[in-house]
Amino acid sequence: PAMARGMIKPLVSFYIGGMGTYYHAMFCRYGWEANANEVRDLYNAGKRKEAAAAVADDLIDAIAICGPADHCRAKLQEWRAAGVGTALMNLPTGAPFEMAAQLLRTMAP
């Protein structure tokens, strides 16, 4: 999970620090105010790598499913049972088509 979290943290830091105030305010409302403020401040200071590294693991775990396939399938099933109807799946930029196809096959219900 740590490697997978590391892959999504830059995107989350962009949402918090680089997309206006909406997502920053949302994370503040959801209980991550201190972390959102730290990430936003680092991001806006041009410290993008530091901002990404500062995104809390528990924040990532609350909004994303990261880790080995068995763990991801189990978490996705938990989310479905909780009422989540649509999940977005992200791959690293430039990932080959076959990687995307394999992800979809692996995560299919």
Q: What are the functions of these language-model segments?
A:
Residues 1-109:
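Active-site-adjacent structural elements that line small-molecule/cofactor binding pockets in enzymes
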